[in-house]
Amino acid sequence: MGQKVHPIGIRLGVVKRHNANWYANPKQYAEYLLKDLQVREFLTKKLKSAMVSNILIERPTGAAKVTISTARPGIVIGKKGEDIEKLQRELTNIMGVPAQVSINEIDRPDLDARLVAEAIASQLEKRVMFRRAMKRAVQNSMRAGAKGIKVEVSGRLGGAEIARTEWYREGRVPLHTLRADIDYATMRAETTYGTIGVKVWIFRGEILGGMKQVMNPAPQEERPAKRGRGRGEGQERRGRRSDRAADKGE
């Protein structure tokens, strides 16, 4: 049975950077890794409503720097910066060294796979029809300038007794092209019928400059997204995969 490699893992060091940037000797490595996991778990719970996409942890000598990518920086910063100061004190207690928190605002959340997956999962938990949630997410991402997007949901869709998988795709999603900027995320929706898994792939274009372009991106002027109908663009595809034949009512 064929399996797919993780879209981000295969691109690390090519067009993607790691979420943790630090070095440690073998005796300290386990301790640092545990603290990183505690920081990510703490921030994920505390900033649940802030639409946090990514958390980058760096460890300069005798200190720590945490960069939070969020679509709602006002929630993280708080009134007059009170919340971010409190957040720095809490992270300092967890990491054991002075922690500095910086905010990276996400201008276009519809091009972020994690935020799109969270939005779909939230709609599924509110009993929105899964096809409507998928199609809405695809349309919003393509309207925001994505070159292609694929959304997949799996589980007891619509309350069916037999679990199945359905997907929806528009545009190109070249998973085997390493220079392709593919954003990927998974999310779980806890519904009354059980857990539904959500996967999102978003193709945002190609990075021809490699890691130099990733680390030092050139400023670009915002332009309205062009909707072409080139190879694979403007095409919609649907798919369905079941462990067994779906019941006649579906």
Swiss-Prot record:
Start-end of Basic and acidic residues biased regions: 220-250
GO cellular component: cytosolic small ribosomal subunit
Top-rank taxon: Bacteria
Molecular function in Gene Ontology: mRNA binding; rRNA binding; structural constituent of ribosome
Residues of the KH type-2 domain: 39-107
Gene3D superfamilies associated with the record: 3.30.300.20, Ribosomal protein S3, C-terminal domain
Entries under SMART domains matching the protein: KH
The family this protein is said to belong to: Belongs to the universal ribosomal protein uS3 family.
Function of the molecule: Binds the lower part of the 30S subunit head. Binds mRNA in the 70S ribosome, positioning it for translation.
Protein known as: Small ribosomal subunit protein uS3
Gene name as annotated: rpsC
